[in-house]
C-alpha cells in the first residue's frame, strides 16, 4: 500500500503485459537516477543489481569501484561466503560419456570397414547393413547429380561450338560468293573491253582500204564476196546519219566516161 497526497494506491502486480513493461522501464530509469544522485551527493558506495522478468540484467556501481569489489566488501563485512560448488562428479560423468562416445565411434568405424565383425550380433549386423545401404544410395544419388551436371555443361559447350561453326561456315560461304562475283565481273569487263578493241581495230583496217574496192561497176560479172558485204554492212551501221553527209557524186576516172551524155557504140 502506497500513501500519496490524493489517496492510497494499492501496490500489486500489473496484469497487462505491455503496461507492466512500460512501468518497469520508467521505474528502473528513476531508480538508477536516484541511486546515482545518492552516490554523488553523499559519496556513498552503492551497488545496484536488477533482473527483469525475462532475466535481463541491469546494474549500477559507484565510481571508481566495480561490482565485484562492492560484493567482496559486502561478504567481508557480513562474514558470509559464497558457496563453493564441487564439480568433480559432474566432470567425471562428462569424461565417462566422452569415452563411451569415442569407443562407439571406433567400433562403428571398424564395422563399416568390415575389420572386426566377430562379436557383432544379428541385429547389429542388420542395422549396419541398412546404414551402409542408405549411405550407398546417397553416394549414388550424388554421383548421378554430378554426372547430370557434367552432361548439361557438355551440351551447352556443344551448342556453343555448333553456333561458332555455323557462323564460320556462313562467313566463308559469303566470302567465297563475293570472290566469285568479283571474278565474274572482272572477266565480263575484260571481255567487253576486248570486243571493243577488236571492233576499233576492224574499223581502222577498213578505213585504210579504198572505198571503191568494195563496189562492182557496170560490166563486172564478179559477185561481191561475203567479207565485202559484211564490211559494207558494218560501215552502213556505223556510218553517221544521211542528213549529216554532204552530197557527192562518184565520177569514173576515165575522161571519156565523165561526159554526162555517154552512149554506147553504134553499129550501122
From Swiss-Prot:
Primary localization class, coarse: nucleus
Which PROSITE patterns does the record match to this protein? K_BOX, MADS_BOX_1, MADS_BOX_2
GO BP of this protein: positive regulation of transcription by RNA polymerase II
State any GO CC term: nucleus
Molecular function (Gene Ontology), one example? DNA-binding transcription factor activity
Subcellular location per UniProt equals: Nucleus
List the residue ranges of the region (Disordered). 243-268
Looking at the record, the residues that make up the K-box domain are: 88-178
User: Which keywords, in A-to-Z order, does the entry hold?
Assistant: DNA-binding, Nucleus, Transcription, Transcription regulation
Question: InterPro entries annotated for this entry?
Answer: MADS-box/MEF2_TF (IPR050142), MEF2-like_N (IPR033896), TF_Kbox (IPR002487), TF_MADSbox (IPR002100), TF_MADSbox_sf (IPR036879)
Q: Which residues form the MADS-box domain?
A: 4-64
Determine if Nucleus is one of this entry's keywords: yes
> What job does the chain carry out?
Probable transcription factor.
Name by which UniProt lists this protein: MADS-box protein FBP24
Q: Which gene encodes it?
A: FBP24
Amino acid at each position: 500500500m502506497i500513501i500519496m497526497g490524493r489517496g492510497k494506491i494499492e501496490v500489486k502486480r500489473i496484469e497487462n503485459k505491455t503496461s507492466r513493461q512500460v512501468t518497469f522501464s520508467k521505474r528502473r530509469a528513476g531508480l538508477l537516477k536516484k541511486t546515482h544522485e545518492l552516490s554523488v551527493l553523499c559519496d556513498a558506495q552503492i551497488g545496484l543489481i536488477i533482473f527483469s522478468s525475462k532475466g535481463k540484467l541491469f546494474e549500477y556501481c559507484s565510481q571508481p569501484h566495480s561490482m565485484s569489489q562492492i560484493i567482496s566488501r559486502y561478504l567481508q563485512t557480513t562474514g558470509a561466503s559464497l558457496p563453493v560448488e564441487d564439480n568433480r562428479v559432474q566432470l567425471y560423468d562428462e569424461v565417462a560419456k566422452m569415452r563411451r562416445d569415442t569407443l562407439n565411434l571406433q567400433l562403428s568405424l571398424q564395422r563399416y570397414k568390415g575389420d572386426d565383425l566377430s562379436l557383432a550380433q544379428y541385429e547389429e549386423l542388420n542395422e549396419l547393413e541398412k546404414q551402409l545401404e542408405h549411405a550407398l544410395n546417397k553416394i549414388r544419388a550424388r554421383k548421378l547429380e554430378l554426372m547430370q551436371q557434367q552432361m548439361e555443361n557438355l551440351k551447352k559447350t556443344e551448342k556453343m561450338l555448333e553456333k561458332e561453326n555455323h557462323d564460320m561456315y556462313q562467313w566463308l560461304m559469303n566470302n567465297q560468293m563475293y570472290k566469285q562475283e568479283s571474278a565474274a565481273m572482272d572477266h565480263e569487263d575484260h571481255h567487253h573491253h576486248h570486243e571493243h578493241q577488236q571492233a576499233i581495230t576492224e574499223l581502222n583496217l577498213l578505213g585504210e582500204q579504198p572505198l571503191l574496192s568494195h563496189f562492182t561497176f557496170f560490166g563486172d560479172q564478179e559477185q561481191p564476196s561475203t567479207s565485202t558485204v559484211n564490211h559494207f554492212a558494218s560501215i552502213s551501221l556505223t556510218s553517221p546519219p544521211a542528213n549529216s553527209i554532204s552530197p557527192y557524186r562518184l565520177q569514173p576516172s576515165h575522161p571519156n566516161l565523165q561526159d554526162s551524155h555517154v552512149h554506147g557504140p553504134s553499129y550501122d
